[in-house]
């Protein structure tokens, strides 16, 4: 994606790492969509817009009815640790991916899944965000919010890493909303 080079280069740690290696940056950039033809197969690279990053794309393998979707979708598990920022921008990115014609999703950091698994993650995130917003508007502390959501979001406790990461997810969303960063 056309924004990737700037994001890659602005990271100090990345710059240090790159200074010790010969790195070839992308020489093809696109804004919204790039179509690859590989034999009789079509792969659409589609920008998901601003959110987790400004260069996040989904690879849509048209004939195989498969997408490769990284970082914004945790398939069959809760989101990683305190989640990324800004969390509210994940929802439009995920909805854009959902508009594609696919059956299988290949994530970057979770199990393979189906289209319904992406919908389930959207439901998880929207519920999490909404309930944290409600708790904050009621003046609840982070700790109170965590305890409330452990009960009110129990319908999602089937997700992997619930015990490890759910309270961290609540913490991340709470801090983003409290600090006004959830939709920046």
State what each model feature region is.
Residues 24-29, 79, 107, 148, ...:
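Proline-rich low-complexity regions
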Residues 3-13, 99-100, 112-184:
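Accessory terminal helices/loops
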Residues 1-127, 131:
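Metallo-beta-lactamase
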Residues 22, 40, 53-54, 165:
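A generic fold-level signal
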């Amino acid at each position: 994606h056309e924004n990737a080079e700037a994001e890659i280069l602005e990271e100090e740690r990345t710059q240090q790492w790159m200074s010790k290696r010969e790195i070839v940056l992308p020489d093809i950039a696109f804004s919204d969509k790039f179509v690859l033809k590989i034999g009789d197969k079509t792969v659409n690279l589609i920008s998901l817009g601003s959110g987790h990053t400004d260069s996040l794309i989904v690879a849509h393998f048209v004939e195989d009815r498969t997408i490769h979707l990284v970082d914004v979708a945790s398939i069959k598990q809760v989101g990683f640790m305190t989640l990324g920022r800004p969390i509210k921008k994940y929802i439009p990115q995920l909805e854009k991916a959902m508009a594609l014609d696919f059956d299988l999703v290949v994530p970057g950091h979770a199990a393979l899944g189906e289209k319904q698994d992406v919908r389930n993650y959207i439901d998880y995130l929207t519920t999490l965000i909404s309930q944290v917003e409600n708790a904050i508007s009621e003046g609840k502390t982070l700790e109170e919010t965590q305890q409330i959501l452990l009960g009110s979001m129990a319908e999602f406790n089937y997700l992997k890493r619930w015990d490890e990461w759910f309270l961290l997810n609540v913490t991340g969303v709470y801090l983003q909303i409290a600090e006004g960063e959830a939709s920046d």
